[in-house]
Amino acid sequence: MKLSELLDSQLIFTELESLEKELFLRKIISRISDVQSSIKESTVIDLILKREKLCSTGLDNFIAIPHAKIPGIDKTYISLCISNNGIDFGSIDGLKTKILILILNPEETGNHHLEILKSVSSLFTKKNVINQMLNIKNPEDIINFIKANE
């Protein structure tokens, strides 16, 4: 499974301001629900924040992958967000998150989310990919860049 096949340019947000983690997540989820009417903002916020309280999804190399299984949706939605100044996500390396990949899966997906997480992590273990992506501002260009590097 390729990340580029799951991305929608309407759910890619660049040049985002640096905010506190919960406020940032609320803002992104609000934007997603504006674009996708099947996304119930309050439900998604509750589930994502509950997941973050269990264990931060901040990884290393400026990446965070918040994710949850969402009732009432029938397909996976992925939002890719870039904040060049970063957000403190409690990442394992102590660095601020600059690239956030928010994954919303239907409840009945089995291990589908694990395939997506594997695809995301294999792409973003390449430091040059991260550095180059931080300079791309156009959502379609981001999708094309990801396709070229998968």
Indicate where each model-derived feature is located.
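Cytosolic covalent-transfer regions centered on His/Cys nucleophiles
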Residues: 1-150
